[in-house]
């Protein structure tokens, strides 16, 4: 018997409704097997650099060129490998993370560039069908995924994949590309401007021109032409190669620099392939540097459309930027700013609980650096003054940021070393303090005693079991410049979170839906006493409190978040899937007022709506033209779907 499949609207995984002629001609639909559904909202992701994490096999350190290795030079390979990661799986299990995102393990260029840099990071690929010799071999990779999938670990592996480009076009290997060791082409040889393997349009000179951003070289990296059928097949087959080796999800590098129609087609084909081998629910999330709920115009304004319709979620850089400004205490950025962003992202992202939220990453200085330094340049787009705080104070602020990251709507990603408060104050060649490569330092250690480690473990465990944290509603309960108290809720599962970046303060909070009682905080030593839906809460500076209730006696909400899913929603060009029903929120059976939903994992479409409590609902799935409501109409057959909003959080229909 098939398990019922469900992604809520809060999913940012979407697929094209209007694919271009080439992509339509290539689409195939796989037969649906018995499969196990994967919902990544239950996951806590840990992002690590393979080369920087742990050296488990010193024999591969030099690779094919000893000049590429120097354990004391962060521009070069420093020794980390797959064997080292295998050896440290017990550590990661104890940390409570459930998914490991690794930098691309594919074969990279074998030489240093003119500035002495190497491909240790994995983003200068030359062969998408081989593992780089510095990291081990395919047997090592399969051993890693087999162990991760075993009952001892029950972890997922996220592959960082770079379909936008290969390697530099003007030095080193000049864009050379191979398939399992067989040479295909390089940038100088393949000179057809827009019909060959590469675009030959030069580098991006106008970052406000979206065509350039997508079709010119990103700096000097050879820009792949994904509309070429051979290129598409190479990238698709490369993805399947890694899925066959055990990959569970893909982080798409530089999604901003590729056409949406390619992303839609590729993610759809990979999703179908994953289903065909019995692994439904393959997850994608992309790197769009500058993606933010606050940015709705210009090139970066397109990020919201990609998040809602491309087939891939995004890393929420807007959340990261807002959180850093609030924690550092930059002028005008308060807990009210953070609360406003959390509310806004629910309105612009169709699927905000599927976007990936994070505090640290590899492209700008770590939060610990920004908190402690008085510099003004920390990385691309991050030219604001640091906090000049003490190490101890900075660590408390990092703890606060971790609690926020782990409890807001979205899938949390923790950058390696954050659990040890990693920070670096070295300036790179661009004058950026603590940025590339100094935010990619060797793993500082593997002890398990820090408060940050404890927070990640505790809240990671909470995420595994709590529907409220996985996909529940977000409601602000109390906020001022320094304190934010909010509720996450799904049915009778309620989590209350309080964050204080200011001086010690006592506040009175009302509208707390949990039953009367005393609730110990899941982190720290505080507790919350609730009586008649109110509490008086004392918070120390930089303190966080997290409580949970699962009582059937919880105060009934005035609204319920209901997740609608329509399965088997195959569409033609210009057609989308809608939900329609007997209540005003569903259009009152008026096709012109039906609610358009998102293709969460095509051909599955989902939406999340807030409806009044104790409401009897009848509804159906319907396909119709996006601009002409009476064209291309196809109704779900059979009886209406029915439910009462007090009785369920999920409801499903199918064509």
UniProtKB/Swiss-Prot annotation:
Free-text comment on the cofactor: Binds 2 calcium ions per subunit.
Keywords: Calcium, Glycosyltransferase, Metal-binding, Signal, Transferase
Signal peptide: 1-30
Domain of life: Bacteria
Family: Belongs to the glycosyl hydrolase 13 family.
Subunit structure comment from the entry: Monomer.
Protein name: Cyclomaltodextrin glucanotransferase
Organism name: Klebsiella oxytoca
Lineage, top ranks: Bacteria, Pseudomonadati, Pseudomonadota, Gammaproteobacteria, Enterobacterales
